[in-house]
Amino acid sequence: MLHSAHKGNEILVSLANAGVQRNGRWLVRGVEFSVSKGEIVTLIGPNGSGKSTSAKMAIGVAKPSEGKVSRKAGLRVGYVPQKLSVDWTMPLSVRRLMTLTGPLPAREIDAALNATGIAHLANAEVQHLSGGEFQRALLARAIARKPDLLVLDEPVQGVDFSGEIALYDLIKNIRNSNDCGILLISHDLHVVMAETDTVICLNGHVCCRGTPQAVSQSPEYMRLFGGTAAKALAVYSHHHDHTHLPDGRVQHADGTVTDHCHPEDGHHHDEDGECGCGHDHGEHGDHAPDGLRQGERHV
C-alpha cells in the first residue's frame, strides 16, 4: 500500500550502491534505498541474503566497503534485534528491560508500555512472557526514546498468525502516532506488512523492488482469516529477471551465466515494480496456495 503523502517527507537515511565485503567475499553489494519520515520500507530475502547487513549499514553499525550511506544529522534510531541474549536464570522485569542501556524517566517507560499494550506487564518477569508479549516489550524499549527511525529485525519471529497481525497493526499505529520512518526486515518472501510503502528483495544484491499487492479478498480467505488479516498483510510478487544457481552463479533470462549479479547485469525496475521477470508464471501468473506464483521456486 503506497502512501504518497510520504514522498515529500524528510529523508532519514539513504544508501547508494552500498556494499560490505568481508575476507574477500561480498556479503551484499549494490544496495540502493532510502527511508523517509513516516515511510515503511521492508527488506526481504533468504537467509544470508544481506538483509541485516544492509540495515546495519543504514544505521552505521556496519561501514560500507563501497558506495555511500547518508543519514540525517542527529538521527535517533530505535532498534529491535532479531535475537536478544538474556540470561534467563537472572530475574529481569519488563520495566528493568526498558532501562538496560540507560536510564529513562518513569513517565516515558509508562507511555511506551501503554503504547504497546503491555502496561499491565510492567513488573512481570521477562522469561514468563509469550513470544508476542516479548516482542511488544522490545518494541516498547525501542520507541521509549522517541526515535526518528525504527529498525525492526524479524519483529514477528516466533509469533503465531494472529499475533503477527496484531504486531503489524501495532507497528502501523506506532508509525502513525510518532511519524517515524520504519525499516523492517522479514524472513517471509511473499507475505509482508500491508502498510509497507516499498518492498526490497535481496539476495546478495537488490533482486527486485516494488509495492505489495492486497491480500486475496476471496470468500475462502476471508472466512479462514477474517477481514483483519487482509488489512494487516499483503502479498508481494517477485519480478526477477535471473535465477541464483546452487553453485552461486547467476543465470539470466537470456540463458547466459555469470559469476555475479550486479545492476548492470540486467536488472531493470519500473515504477510499478515490474522488471522483466525471468520466471515462468503460467498463462495467468496465478499464485499457488503457498504464496508462490505458479511455476516459481526460488533457488
UniProtKB/Swiss-Prot annotation:
Q: What is its EC number?
A: 7.2.2.20
- The keyword Zinc is annotated on this UniProt entry: yes
Specify which residues bind ATP according to the UniProt entry for this protein: 45-52
Topology with respect to the bilayer? Peripheral membrane protein
Reactions catalysed according to its record: Zn(2+)(out) + ATP(in) + H2O(in) = Zn(2+)(in) + ADP(in) + phosphate(in) + H(+)(in)
Any single GO BP term: response to zinc ion
Which subcellular locations apply to this protein?
A: Cell inner membrane
Stored InterPro entries: AAA+_ATPase (IPR003593), ABC_transporter-like_ATP-bd (IPR003439), ABC_transporter-like_CS (IPR017871), Metal_Ion_Import_ABC (IPR050153), P-loop_NTPase (IPR027417)
Show the PROSITE patterns listed in the entry: ABC_TRANSPORTER_1, ABC_TRANSPORTER_2, ZNUC
- Which top-rank group of organisms is this from? Bacteria
Q: Start and end of every ABC transporter domain?
A: 13-228
Q: Name one Pfam family in it.
A: ABC_tran
- Gene3D superfamilies given in the database record: P-loop containing nucleotide triphosphate hydrolases
Which keywords does the record carry? ATP-binding, Cell inner membrane, Cell membrane, Ion transport, Membrane, Nucleotide-binding, Translocase, Transport, Zinc, Zinc transport
GO cellular component: a single term: plasma membrane
Q: Which family does it belong to?
A: Belongs to the ABC transporter superfamily. Zinc importer (TC 3.A.1.15.5) family.
Role according to the record: Part of the ABC transporter complex ZnuABC involved in zinc import. Responsible for energy coupling to the transport system.
PANTHER family reported for this sequence: METAL TRANSPORT SYSTEM ATP-BINDING PROTEIN TM_0124-RELATED, ZINC IMPORT ATP-BINDING PROTEIN ZNUC
| Name listed for the protein in its UniProt record | Zinc import ATP-binding protein ZnuC
Taxonomy of origin reads:
Bacteria, Pseudomonadati, Pseudomonadota, Alphaproteobacteria, Hyphomicrobiales
